[in-house]
Structures are given as C-alpha cells and as structure tokens.
C-alpha cells in the first residue's frame, strides 16, 4: 500500500470518527440536561424533606409518603442510573478513550472530537 492510499485511509477513518462523535453530542447533551434537572429536583426535595420538623416525629416510610416530590424524584434518579445514564452522559469520551488505546499501537492518538493526532515515529538506534 503506498503512502497516498494510507493517507486516504487515515482521512476516511478520521472523517468517520469525527462524524460518529459529533452525532453523539446532541444525545449526550439531552441526557446531561435530564440528569441535571432530576438531580436538582432530588436535592431540592431532599432539602425540604430534611428541614421539615415532622420528618423526625414520624416513621421513615410515612415521612417519604408526606414528601412525594422527593420520593418520586429520588426513584427517578435511581431508575436513570439503573438505565445507564452515567454511561450515556460520557459516551463521546468513552469512544475517544477506546480509540486512543487502539491508536497508541500505531503511534497515533485522537482528541475528544475525533481528530487524529499523528505522533513521530520512535527512532531505533
């Protein structure tokens, strides 16, 4: 394979990688916004639950029943983590890290957007 074909292959690989990473960005942004909203709701509900004087006087389950906003938001947050939201919010970083691992064998790397970084060849003496 001559160097022109190799360069074309590298360019095609880089285009495909940047395309894939950029296609993940909108979805990742939506998952991040959902996680932020549910986290803020859970924190707000937890604050209201903790400062309520009735919380100390009643049983735990009665206290949760008296604070449905906190209960629902907490269950939603737990459900999101079981559904894998912690992986979805960092999906482009995971893809880039895995590509870096593979590309390291070929003296290459890539940034978080998928652009290839060519490293100089090691000099053998």
Curated annotation (Swiss-Prot):
Annotated GO CC locations: cytoplasm; Nem1-Spo7 phosphatase complex; nuclear membrane
Membrane-topology descriptor: Multi-pass membrane protein
Keyword field: Cytoplasm, Lipid metabolism, Membrane, Nucleus, Transmembrane, Transmembrane helix
A Pfam short name: Tmemb_18A
Record localization: Nucleus membrane; Cytoplasm
Keyword Disulfide bond: no
GO molecular-function term, one example from the UniProt record: protein phosphatase regulator activity
InterPro entries according to UniProt: NEP1-R1
Transmembrane region(s): 33-53, 65-85
Function: May form with the serine/threonine protein phosphatase ctdnep1 an active complex dephosphorylating and activating lipins. Lipins are phosphatidate phosphatases that catalyze the conversion of phosphatidic acid to diacylglycerol and control the metabolism of fatty acids at different levels. May indirectly modulate the lipid composition of nuclear and/or endoplasmic reticulum membranes and be required for proper nuclear membrane morphology and/or dynamics. May also indirectly regulate the production of lipid droplets and triacylglycerol.
PANTHER family: NUCLEAR ENVELOPE PHOSPHATASE-REGULATORY SUBUNIT 1
Entry protein name: Nuclear envelope phosphatase-regulatory subunit 1
Protein's organism: Xenopus laevis (African clawed frog)
Gene: cnep1r1
């Amino acid at each position: 394979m001559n160097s022109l074909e190799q360069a074309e292959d590298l360019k095609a690989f880089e285009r495909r990688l940047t395309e894939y990473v950029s296609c993940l960005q909108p979805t990742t942004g939506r998952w991040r916004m959902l996680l932020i909203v549910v986290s803020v709701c859970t924190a707000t509900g937890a604050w209201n639950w903790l400062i309520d004087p009735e919380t100390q006087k009643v049983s735990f389950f009665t206290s949760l029943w008296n604070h449905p906003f906190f209960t629902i938001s907490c269950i939603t947050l737990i459900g999101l983590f079981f559904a894998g939201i912690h992986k979805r919010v960092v999906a482009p970083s995971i893809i880039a890290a895995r590509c870096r691992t593979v590309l390291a064998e070929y003296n290459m790397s890539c940034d978080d957007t998928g652009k290839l970084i060519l490293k100089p060849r090691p000099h053998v003496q």
